[in-house]
């Protein structure tokens, strides 16, 4: 596997820490050892997160190509757009963000706090759009790029989740290589890796990265899109493309992609009672915050699988914390009593 041939522009502090979730593990019976790898602590750029790791492999193209405006898209509380705005500010570029109405959630401050608030503070041109949730290429995003061109700018396209960019999966191939190095220091290998999946490139990169040591199907994706067929297809497609890019040496198959569909409901961006219980339990056992859109759902999945005995006794499970906590402010009504 050859990841080193791709240029990388450092936006993160370095390897993200792995630490044990001792109290949560004990609370769930102590038969499974839970750990977290903290992508939510990966950068000083506006709280960082998994998209910041991905952007390290996209930004060299933007710099070398002389692009002056980063153009991205997401929901109103998109973590992606906040991270793109931060990178643009860091690099001295302009930023245009299309924020679509991906979540059927009514709150008076939903479009004024959290991620979107930070993007505005960082100087991004934030454009609200009424279109609903979809993980594909969007007309509103294409229109934003055309607007930049007409104004004399040179837009660099960054699709939702970085996922439709040909190099969108590389950052999490690097994640897998980083985990392997940390496992050498820890003196053991993780048996399973749990990760949230929506647009697909995070899990796709992990699948390729861990395929290098035979653990592709030990990456347990927890769907948070509530459109799992579309998400699964995208994970598989991106993983196959990424495997070719890094010269993995074997094809990624359907069996390599594990996507658990039990925890994504009722729909994208809306937590269920299990999500909320998992957020509170993790926070109160470990002081580790997760959000109602992504990480709360993957945390719910991991907790439920431990409770159900789906991980064999003695397993070591690595939870990939991808970020997303800034969105908590937009859901403050749900937590008004804690």
Curated annotation (Swiss-Prot):
Coiled-coil positions: none
Residue numbers bearing the N6-(pyridoxal phosphate)lysine modification: 51
UniProt enzyme class: hydrolase
Segments traversing the membrane: none
GO biological process: 1-aminocyclopropane-1-carboxylate metabolic process; amine catabolic process
Catalyses which reaction(s): 1-aminocyclopropane-1-carboxylate + H2O = 2-oxobutanoate + NH4(+)
Matching InterPro entries: ACCD_DCysDesulf (IPR027278), ACP_carboxylate_deaminase (IPR005965), ACP_carboxylate_deaminase_bac (IPR020601), TrpB-like_PALP (IPR001926), TrpB-like_PALP_sf (IPR036052)
EC number(s) per entry: 3.5.99.7
UniProtKB keywords: Hydrolase, Pyridoxal phosphate
Cofactor: pyridoxal 5'-phosphate
GO MF terms held by the record: 1-aminocyclopropane-1-carboxylate deaminase activity; D-cysteine desulfhydrase activity; pyridoxal phosphate binding
Active site (record annotation): 78
Pfam families, per the entry: PALP (PF00291)
Superkingdom of the organism of origin: Bacteria
Protein's job: Catalyzes a cyclopropane ring-opening reaction, the irreversible conversion of 1-aminocyclopropane-1-carboxylate (ACC) to ammonia and alpha-ketobutyrate. Allows growth on ACC as a nitrogen source.
Family annotation (PANTHER family): 1-AMINOCYCLOPROPANE-1-CARBOXYLATE DEAMINASE-RELATED
Similarity comment: family membership: Belongs to the ACC deaminase/D-cysteine desulfhydrase family.
Protein name in the entry: 1-aminocyclopropane-1-carboxylate deaminase
Source organism per UniProt: Paracidovorax citrulli (strain AAC00-1) (Acidovorax citrulli)
């Amino acid at each position: 596997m050859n990841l080193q041939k791709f240029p990388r522009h450092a936006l993160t502090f370095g390897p993200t820490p792995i630490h044990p979730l001792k109290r949560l593990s004990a609370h769930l019976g102590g038969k499974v050892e839970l750990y977290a790898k903290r992508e939510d602590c990966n950068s000083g750029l506006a709280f960082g997160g998994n998209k910041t790791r991905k952007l390290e492999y996209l930004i060299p193209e933007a710099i070398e190509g002389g692009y002056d405006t980063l153009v991205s898209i997401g929901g109103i509380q998109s973590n992606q757009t906040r991270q793109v705005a931060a990178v643009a500010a860091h690099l001295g570029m302009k930023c245009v963000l299309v924020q679509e109405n991906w979540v059927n959630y009514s709150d008076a401050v939903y479009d004024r706090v959290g991620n979107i608030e930070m993007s505005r503070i960082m100087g991004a041109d934030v454009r609200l759009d009424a279109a609903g949730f979809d993980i594909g290429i969007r007309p509103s995003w294409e229109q934003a790029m055309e607007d930049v061109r007409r104004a004399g700018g040179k837009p660099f396209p960054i699709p939702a989740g970085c996922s439709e960019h040909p190099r969108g999966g590389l950052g999490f191939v690097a994640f897998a290589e980083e985990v392997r190095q940390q496992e050498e220091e820890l003196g053991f290998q993780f048996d399973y890796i749990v990760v949230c999946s929506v647009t697909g490139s995070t899990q796709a990169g992990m699948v390729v990265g861990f395929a290098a040591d035979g653990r592709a199907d030990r990456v347990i994706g927890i769907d948070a899109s509530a459109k799992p067929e579309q998400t699964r297809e995208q994970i598989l497609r991106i993983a196959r493309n990424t495997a070719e890019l890094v010269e993995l040496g074997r094809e990624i198959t359907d069996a390599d992609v594990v996507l658990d569909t039990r925890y994504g409901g009722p729909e994208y961006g809306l937590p269920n009672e299990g999500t909320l219980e998992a957020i509170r339990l993790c926070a109160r056992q470990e002081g580790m915050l997760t959000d109602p859109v992504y990480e709360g759902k993957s945390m719910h999945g991991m907790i439920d699988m431990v409770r159900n005995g789906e991980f064999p006794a003695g397993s070591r499970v690595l939870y990939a914390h991808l970020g997303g906590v800034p969105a908590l402010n937009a859901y403050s009504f749900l937590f008004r009593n804690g």
